[in-house]
């Protein structure tokens, strides 16, 4: 799986900075080593369920450590992942599934149930995912016209009908390398995250992971809920 450059970004971060904080959230601090281990465990669960290279899988969740693990675990299987906001209405989710021809969808139960099928319950260290395959044949390859696809995201649709954009592993890494030449983020930096991860994963969350910056995930946007101790650690 040497071609899975996006997954390697997390794996390499765990090797370089195993005890450095990757995520601050309402459950405490999660190190890069812990984030990678939980992602690996979820990846193997998905592989055992039948997720594999050539598939498209949606991950619908709120801003959370599990959303990050979910995105990377799908990519680690060799599949293409679509980050989906948990705030979408059922009709909007139905449109996405129909337009994107995803093979499966996994969600954290914080939004509508995305698919009317029997789902597999996948426990995480905190909370859980539910997973189900769609009616798309597993033999139908997803984004066959793109070399080494990693992400699919839909445009906002403000200038017309939403369109799916495929981003390859190579393109995703090139984007964040270019962005960080300006941002200069690295180990010891912490980004307080308030925007929807589903719409900003590639050039934000992936960038922070690759360069060792911690992500402080807020439950809401109120400054009073973001506190920092004398050591610079965030507690929400």
Question: Model-derived features: where do they sit?
Answer:
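Structural motif
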Residues: 60-62, 86-87, 106-110, 125, ...
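Conserved pre-ATP/AMP-binding loop-to-beta segment of ANL
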Residues: 3, 19, 136-154, 161, ...
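Conserved helix-loop-beta element of the AMP-binding
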Residues: 101-103, 117-129, 172, 190-192, ...
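Conserved AMP-binding/adenylation subdomain of ANL enzymes
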Residues: 173-190, 197-236
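ANL superfamily adenylate-forming
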Residues: 107-147, 161
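Solvent-exposed alpha-helix faces
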Residues: 40-44, 160, 177-180
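Conserved AMP-binding/adenylate-forming core of the ANL superfamily
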Residues: 2, 6, 11, 19-50, ...
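A short helix-loop-beta submotif of the ANL/AMP-binding
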Residues: 55-56, 62-82, 86-90, 99-103, ...
């Amino acid at each position: 799986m040497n071609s899975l450059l996006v997954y390697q970004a997390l794996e390499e971060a765990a090797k370089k900075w195993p005890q450095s904080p990757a995520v601050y959230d309402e459950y405490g601090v999660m190190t890069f080593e812990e984030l990678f281990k939980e992602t690996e465990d979820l990846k193997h669960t998905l592989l055992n369920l039948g997720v594999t290279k050539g598939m498209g899988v949606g991950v619908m969740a709120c801003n959370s450590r599990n959303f990050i693990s979910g995105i990377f675990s799908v990519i680690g299987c060799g599949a293409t992942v679509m980050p989906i906001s948990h705030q979408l209405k059922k009709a909007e989710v139905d449109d996405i599934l129909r337009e994107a021809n995803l093979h499966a969808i996994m969600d954290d139960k914080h939004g509508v149930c995305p698919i009317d099928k029997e789902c597999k319950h996948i426990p995480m260290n905190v909370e859980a995912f539910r997973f189900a395959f769609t009616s798309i044949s597993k033999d139908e390859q997803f984004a066959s016209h793109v070399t080494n696809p990693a992400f699919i995201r839909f445009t906002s649709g403000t200038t017309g009908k939403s369109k799916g954009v495929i981003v390859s592993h190579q393109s995703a890494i090139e984007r964040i390398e270019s962005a960080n030449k300006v941002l200069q983020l690295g180990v010891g930096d912490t980004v307080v995250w308030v925007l929807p991860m589903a719409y900003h994963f590639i050039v934000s969350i992936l960038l922070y992971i690759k360069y060792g910056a911690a992500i402080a995930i807020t439950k809401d946007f109120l400054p009073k809920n973001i506190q920092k101790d004398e050591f610079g650690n965030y507690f929400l």
